Amino acid sequence: ENVKKTKEVVLYVKSINPDILVEGEIGYIGSASEVREELPEGVAIKPEDLTTPEEAKQFVYETGVDMLAPAVGNLHGMFANMPDPNLDIDRIRAIKEAVKLPLVLHGGSGNTDRDFRMAIQAGVVVVHINTEIRLAWRKGLEAGLSSNPNEVAPYKILPLAFEGVKGVVLKRLKLFNKLDTPLA
């Protein structure tokens, strides 16, 4: 089903503009951008559930995607009180070698800085951190509302939400672009 739908999207997009890049996701990464206390029941991130280089290569061949988002220990959403499970960096390297395409990390929120940097060095070129950004926005909005509970003007409430998002984005941009710094 995933292959069929992804191939349809690729064909449609390329018929409109062949220069538009299409990204495809393979493997179980979850489906919700939310903050969790623990892994949902029945969900376990086991090595045998992650995308293999062979599966990735076949998916790319059958769909024609320009970028690939494989399951490599990542999960949509993030945990409240602990980092997400570790990314399989060796698997990222092997998939990159097999598909020879840019790799995308879906479900990046909650991963450690070390995992991000190692994943980028192994071949990831795009990192999705949507839950982390949404959480910063929500916390900023809540702070804006609680600091003046009678305020109703959005332009007076929203600046803390925007600052929260800006802080996360700047922090991640700095991290993602400091690849020459040795890993500790």
Residue spans for each PLM region:
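Active-site-adjacent substrate-binding region
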Residues: 102
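Alpha/beta enzyme core
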Residues: 1-99, 113-129, 135, 139-143, ...
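Extended, intrinsically disordered, low-complexity segments
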Residues: 144-184
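Thr-Gly-centered strand-to-loop micro-motif
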Residues: 105-107
